[in-house]
């Protein structure tokens, strides 16, 4: 099965549409990593419609329609949520959580592009998504004839891509710093708790954090407890603004979590080329190569997403103190 990150999945799906590949497609992956969001974003980018059906919540008659007598025969009136014209994506989400009877009706849509007298219009792509058994999801086995008709893609989490998303959407830099420090907590299913960390739940947790609420209901008690301990360390960091202005050069923290917190905070809060320069020179002089690389990576991610890459490269090449990271920055920005 082809394995992709979220960003690569987006590129793959866009290419499928641009080349008009009408084969049905199945996206596998753990819950909470953004499968549905990617499909929604692709539809928006391609300027086509999206019909998102949670198959696990439908009954067989919901897809097949209602029988209506006509001249001693029964005609089936299809549901109004199925497409009749135009171009778009018919997205059958949670397909393997649906009971076999519903999967059987969905199979007709996928294999034959029709159910009864209803025909899926030519301009529509039929895509599906589902969780895997190893994710502790209540899923049914997919029949072999159905599985064999799909293009199968498996998507996984990627911290660098989540950080890029987090920076674009202004997720609190304490969350980004914490996940730099504890990357395994980006996504960790807890089968004994309804709440656990995932890209989706961190997004929700950020909203709770902004409202001065505990994030336990979003990411779970154990993860939230670690995050609170990290935030206490965050409060002990030296003031960020004087460093960015080049007016202070305090001692670099000795605590590992504080090192992650400070380097990320500098990267996130540096808004101008000069502030980035001051931040990198400070980290280089006080912390050394490892932390300069970490800070440079975060800065590069931010400036690439903000489409200011050239300014960053020019500044680093011009600064003799930072020439050692110039090649790495150019590679990161070109990725």
Q: Where in the sequence are the language-model features?
A:
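Glycine- and charge-rich intrinsically disordered segments
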Residues: 1-11, 261-264, 328-335
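AAA+ P-loop NTPase catalytic core and its hallmark functional loops
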Residues: 1-182
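Glutamate identity and glutamate-enriched acidic tracts
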Residues: 18, 40, 71, 94, ...
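Alpha-helical lid/collar subdomain of P-loop NTPases
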Residues: 168-306
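Long, positively charged, glycine-interspersed low-complexity recognition regions
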Residues: 284-335
């Amino acid at each position: 099965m082809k394995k992709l990150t979220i960003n690569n999945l987006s590129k793959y799906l866009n290419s499928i549409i641009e080349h008009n590949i009408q084969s049905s497609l199945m996206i596998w992956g753990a819950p909470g990593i953004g499968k549905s969001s990617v499909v929604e974003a692709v539809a928006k980018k391609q300027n086509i419609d999206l019909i998102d059906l949670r198959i696990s919540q439908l009954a067989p008659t919901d897809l097949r329609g209602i029988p209506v007598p006509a001249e001693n025969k029964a005609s089936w009136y299809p549901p109004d949520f199925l497409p009749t014209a135009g171009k778009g994506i018919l997205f059958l989400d949670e397909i393997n959580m649906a009971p076999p009877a519903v999967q059987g009706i969905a199979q007709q849509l996928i294999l034959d592009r029709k159910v009864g007298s209803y025909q899926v219009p030519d301009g529509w792509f039929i895509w599906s998504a589902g969780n895997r058994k190893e994710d502790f999801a209540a899923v049914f086995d997919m029949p072999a004839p159905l599985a064999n008709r799909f293009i199968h893609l498996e998507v996984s989490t990627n911290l660098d891509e989540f950080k890029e998303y987090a920076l674009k959407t202004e997720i609190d830099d304490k969350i980004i710093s914490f996940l730099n420090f504890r990357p395994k907590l980006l996504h960790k299913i807890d089968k004994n708790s309804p709440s656990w960390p995932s890209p989706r739940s961190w997004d929700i947790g950020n909203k709770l954090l902004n409202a001065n609420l505990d994030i336990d209901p979003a990411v779970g008690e154990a993860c939230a407890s670690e995050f609170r301990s990290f935030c206490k360390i965050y409060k002990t960091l030296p003031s960020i603004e004087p460093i960015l202005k080049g007016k202070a050069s305090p001692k670099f923290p000795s605590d590992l979590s504080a090192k992650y917190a400070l380097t990320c905070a500098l990267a996130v809060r540096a808004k101008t080329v000069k502030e980035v320069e001051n931040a990198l020179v400070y980290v280089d002089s006080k912390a050394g190569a490892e932390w300069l690389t970490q800070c440079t990576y975060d800065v590069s991610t931010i400036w690439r997403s903000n489409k200011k890459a050239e300014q960053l490269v020019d500044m680093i090449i011009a600064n003799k103190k930072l020439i050692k990271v110039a090649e790495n920055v150019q590679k990161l920005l070109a990725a």
